[in-house]
C-alpha cells in the first residue's frame, strides 16, 4: 500500500534511463554496471522504546550486530558489516552508528493503531526520534550521502514484538519520509526502514533493507500487484527470498553484484572452454545489448549459501528495463532478473 517513490528508487530510475539511452546505439556491448557501491559507507540505526515497553536488547549488542567482525550473537553468521564485506569480496565496508534508546512520546498502541493509514505513525515516530537527535547535537556529518546530500541509510529498531498484521501500523517496512528531514550542511534524511527487535536480532531483513538503501538494489520477488504471484529468483538472492535461515541469508546474486561493481573478474563469452570458481565474484557475461544479457556464476551450498536449494552454475537472464512483475515469459515482457531453470518448466515464474 506504500506507493511514494523512495530516494533509492529515484537513483535506480536515473540509471535505467541511461541504459535505455545506451540501447539506442548500434552494436552489441558489455552491459555497463549501474552506480557502483564500493568503499566505506556509514549508516544510522535509531533505537526506539515506548513509555509502556522498554527496550530489552542493549545498545552495545546492537552495535556489535551491526559492526563487529566475526559476530555470533543469537546464532548469526557474522555482523551486518561482515555480510556486506563478504558478499562484495571486501569492496563494500558498511558500518553503522547506533544511537542510545529514544523513548517515544506516546504509548506503543498509538503507533500500532491499525485504523491509521499505513506508514503515517511510523513516520511520526521516526521524525520524533530524529528531532530529538538533532536537538541534542547529534553529529550527522559522518553519515554517507549521495550526490544530492541524501543520507543513504536510516534504520529504526523498535522495542518488542510486532503487534500488527501486514500493511498496518508498525509492520516492518521500508519507505520515505513525507518530506526530507534537514540536518544541516545540505544533508537530509528521507529513506528509512523500520523493524521490531523482538527477543533477538537476525541478519536477513536488516541486510535486505540496507541493500535497498545503500546499494539501490531492487526487490527481485513479485509484488503480485497484477494479482499473479511468482517467485522471482527464489532463494538465490538476498533481494528475493534470501534462503531459509534468517541468521545466515544467502548471497546477493551475480546481477546485483555486477551492478554494484563487486565483480572480481568478468569474462565475455564467445567460444571456447571456460572455468569459473564458486568462492569468488567471477562471472561469465553473454550480452545482447547494454541492458539485456545473461550473467553466470558458480554457487555452492556452503558458508553464506548453505541453504541454497542446489549447487552449480546459476544462469540469470537480465533485462534491466524489465520488472519482476512480468511473469508471462514472453519475448517482449521480461523479468528484470530471472534464474534459468534446467527443466524449462518455469517453476519460479
What is each model feature region?
Residues 56-69, 250-254, 326-337:
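Short, polar loop/linker segments at the starts of domains and inter-domain junctions
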Residues 1-63:
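Primarily auto-inhibitory N-terminal propeptides
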Residues 50, 131-138, 212, 216-220:
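Sec-exported extracytoplasmic/periplasmic mature domains
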Residues 54-92:
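Active-site-surrounding "flap" and adjacent substrate/cofactor-binding loops of secreted or lumenal enzymes
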Residues 56, 119-124, 200-201, 205:
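Soluble non-cytosolic domains of exported or imported proteins
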Residues 1, 44, 304-349:
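Intrinsic-disorder/low-complexity accessory segments
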Residues 81, 153-310, 316-321:
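Extracellular hydrolytic enzyme modules, especially secreted metalloproteases
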Residues 26-35, 78-185:
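Active-site-proximal segments of metallohydrolase catalytic domains
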Amino acid at each position: 500500500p506504500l506507493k511514494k517513490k523512495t530516494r533509492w528508487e529515484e537513483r535506480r530510475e536515473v540509471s535505467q534511463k541511461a541504459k535505455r539511452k545506451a540501447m539506442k546505439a548500434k552494436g552489441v556491448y558489455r552491459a555497463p554496471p549501474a552506480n557502483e557501491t564500493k568503499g566505506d559507507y556509514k549508516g544510522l540505526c535509531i533505537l526506539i522504546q515506548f513509555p509502556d515497553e522498554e527496550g530489552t536488547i542493549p545498545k552495545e549488542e546492537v552495535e556489535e550486530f551491526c559492526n563487529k567482525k566475526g559476530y555470533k550473537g543469537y546464532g548469526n553468521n557474522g555482523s551486518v558489516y561482515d555480510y556486506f564485506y563478504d558478499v562484495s569480496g571486501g569492496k563494500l565496508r558498511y558500518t553503522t552508528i547506533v544511537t542510545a534508546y529514544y523513548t517515544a512520546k506516546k504509548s506503543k498502541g498509538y503507533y500500532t493503531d491499525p485504523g491509521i493509514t499505513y506508514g503515517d505513525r511510523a513516520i511520526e515516530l521516526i521524525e520524533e526520534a530524529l528531532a530529538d537527535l538533532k536537538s541534542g547535537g547529534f553529529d550527522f556529518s559522518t553519515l554517507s550521502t549521495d550526490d544530492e546530500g541524501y543520507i543513504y541509510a536510516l534504520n529504526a529498531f523498535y522495542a518488542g514484538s510486532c503487534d500488527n498484521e501486514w500493511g498496518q501500523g508498525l509492520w516492518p517496512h521500508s519507505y520515505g519520509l513525507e518530506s526530507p528531514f534537514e540536518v544541516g550542511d545540505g544533508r537530509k534524511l528521507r529513506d528509512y526502514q523500520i523493524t521490531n527487535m523482538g527477543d533477538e536480532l537476525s541478519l536477513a531483513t536488516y541486510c535486505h533493507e540496507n541493500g535497498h538503501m545503500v546499494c539501490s538494489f531492487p526487490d527481485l520477488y513479485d509484488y503480485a500487484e497484477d494479482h499473479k504471484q511468482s517467485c522471482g529468483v527464489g532463494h538465490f538472492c538476498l533481494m528475493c527470498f534470501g534462503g531459509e535461515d534468517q541468521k545466515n541469508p544467502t548471497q546477493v546474486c551475480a546481477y546485483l553484484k555486477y551492478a554494484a561493481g563487486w565483480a572480481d573478474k568478468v569474462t565475455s563469452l564467445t567460444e571456447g572452454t571456460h572455468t569459473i570458481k564458486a568462492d569468488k565474484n567471477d562471472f561469465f557475461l553473454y550480452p545482447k545489448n547494454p541492458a539485456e544479457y545473461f550473467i553466470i556464476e558458480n554457487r555452492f551450498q556452503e558458508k553464506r549459501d548453505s541453504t541454497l536449494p542446489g549447487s552449480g552454475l546459476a544462469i540469470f537472464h537480465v533485462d534491466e528495463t524489465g520488472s519482476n512483475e512480468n511473469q508471462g515469459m514472453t519475448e517482449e515482457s521480461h523479468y528484470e532478473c530471472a534464474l534459468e531453470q534446467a527443466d524449462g518448466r518455469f517453476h519460479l515464474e
